[in-house]
Amino acid sequence: ECKGFGKSCVPGKNECCSGLTCSNKHKWCKVLL
C-alpha cells in the first residue's frame, strides 16, 4: 500500500504513491516535478 500526498515517509524507500516522491528535507510525500 502506497503513501499519499503529505504522508510521512522514509527517503529512498519508494513508499509514496505514483507521481509522488519522498522529500529528503521534510520526510513526507510530495508531488514529483
Curated annotation (Swiss-Prot):
It comes from the Eukaryota. It is found in: Secreted. InterPro entries: Huwentoxin-1 (IPR011696), Huwentoxin_CS1 (IPR013140). The keyword Disulfide bond applies. GO terms for cellular component: extracellular region. GO terms for molecular function: ion channel inhibitor activity; sodium channel regulator activity; toxin activity. It holds the Pfam family Toxin_12. Potently and reversibly inhibits some human voltage-gated sodium channels (Nav1.1/SCN1A (IC(50)=72.0 nM), Nav1.2/SCN2A (IC(50)=75.5 nM), Nav1.6/SCN8A (IC(50)=115.0 nM), Nav1.7/SCN9A (IC(50)=52.7-129.5 nM), Nav1.3/SCN3A (IC(50)=306.6 nM)). The hNav1.7/SCN9A channel inhibition occurs without any change in steady-state inactivation- and conductance-voltage relationships. On adult mouse DRG neurons, this toxin is approximately 1000-fold more efficient to inhibit tetrodotoxin (TTX)-sensitive than TTX-resistant sodium currents. In vivo, this toxin exhibits analgesic effects in mice pain models. Shows low or no activity on hNav1.4/SCN4A (IC(50)=7.7 uM), hNav1.5/SCN5A (IC(50)>10 uM), hNav1.8/SCN10A (IC(50)>10 uM), hCav1.2/CACNA1C, hCav3.1/CACNA1G, hCav3.2CACNA1H, hKv7.1/KCNQ1, Kv11.1/KCNH2/ERG1, and hKir2.1/KCNJ2/IRK1 channels. This is Mu-theraphotoxin-Os1a.
